[in-house]
Amino acid sequence: MDNEAFTMGYFRLLAAKLSPHGYEPKQLVDAIWAGTAAMVKNDGTRSNEDAFWKKFAGVYGEKALADKPLFDEFYENDFQTAKAFCGVNPKAAETVHTLKEMGLRAALATNPIFPAVATESRIRWAGLEPEDFELRTTYENIGYCKPNPDYYREIAARLGVRPEECLMVGNDVTEDMIAQSIGMQVFLLTDCLINKERKDISLYPRGSFLQLLDHIETHQCHSKSAERQE
């Protein structure tokens, strides 16, 4: 997915929805970014939802809280048009289905800056269902964001596993590969690579969706071999 195209399209849709209700587009976008920054800085003491709305209401006052149903309505309806800004790679859904057929557990570790209704829509746009994932992080159900390592610690804790038992698969070098710092195994998808800081990607196992499956199958074989030796 082209993140820039999606973000621009998303803001256009949101401004079109809210400008008739007194939200000037530029100020609205600035306030959304400020709320997003508050979520990224969140330390787990509150939900990302609460962090966002506290900051957003700091710009618009109580009006913002009173207008929250407008935002809910936007995500239920207008936001669905944003699918046009998302490039869908069918290999993503195919890979998730294959992993589940292999008996592996799947969690959607997407940056939790959107409400559940938006996240679930994006899952369906990708050809999957929310129920395909044991856990889906949204701004309502977690108090951290990427690239905070505590975000990944929280996911492992909720799944009831040690970080070392997890494989974080992602395409963003900065936001996803940080999971390695808490002991998670990682795999960098290079089909749609994001590397804004131009980091050395040779440090990570990496490749396409097909190579990801090969990587997992190889790892499983090694694990089973080690178990037999024990």
Give the residues covered by each predicted segment:
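Asp-based, Mg2+/Mn2+-dependent phosphohydrolase catalytic module
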Residues: A93, H97-T98, I113-F114, T119-E230
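A cross-family glycoside hydrolase active-site/sugar-binding cleft signature
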Residues: A109-N111
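A metal-dependent, Asp-based hydrolase signature
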Residues: K26-E76
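Short, acidic loop-to-helix structural element flanking the phosphoryl-transfer center
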Residues: S47-A51, L65-P69, E76-A107
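Short helix-capping segments at alpha-helix termini
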Residues: S19-P25, E62, G127-D132, G160
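Hydrophobic alpha-helical core bundles mediating ligand binding, dimerization, or RNAP-core interactions
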Residues: T7-A15, I32-T36, W53, F71-A82, ...
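Short, solvent-exposed loop/turn segments at secondary-structure boundaries
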Residues: D2-A5, D43, D200-I201
